[in-house]
């Protein structure tokens, strides 16, 4: 069910409580924390380091200047997706889509009316 976590040696993903992710130099450090067991003072954790992928990105096409940028490792994104499924509860769609659209439309009407009034006031100043 969680092939990437299993690949990291985590055979019981239900024990995962949370995780943290930080960047150190040219590496991303993923730390996974497990639920504290009876009799333990601290929760067990494991740490994994992933090298950042380096890419050259065209900055200015006229002068053909490139800039070296780093981005998160693809394998790490797959692991994080699995961790999010475990640690973050599924979102509840509380807002009715039709109601949200109507609310957004009313807000847009107010914004447009306000902008029209502002432009008309500016026109009056020019007379």
From Swiss-Prot:
Highest taxon listed in the record's lineage: Bacteria
Alphabetized InterPro entries for the sequence: UPF0325
Family of the protein in this entry: Belongs to the UPF0325 family.
NCBIfam families (UniProt xref): PRK13677.1
Protein's recorded name: UPF0325 protein VV2560
């Amino acid at each position: 069910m969680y092939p990437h976590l299993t690949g990291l040696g985590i055979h019981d993903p239900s024990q995962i409580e949370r995780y943290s992710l930080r960047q150190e130099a040219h590496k991303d450090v993923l730390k996974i924390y497990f639920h504290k067991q009876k009799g333990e003072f601290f929760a067990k954790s494991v740490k994994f380091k992933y090298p950042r992928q380096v890419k050259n990105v065209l900055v200015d096409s006229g002068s053909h200047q490139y800039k070296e940028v780093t981005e998160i490792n693809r394998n790490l994104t797959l692991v994080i997706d699995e961790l999010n499924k475990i640690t973050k509860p599924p979102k509840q769609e509380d807002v009715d889509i039709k109601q949200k659209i109507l609310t957004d439309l009313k807000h847009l009407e107010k914004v447009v009316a306000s902008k029209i009034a502002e432009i008309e006031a500016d026109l009056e100043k020019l007379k």
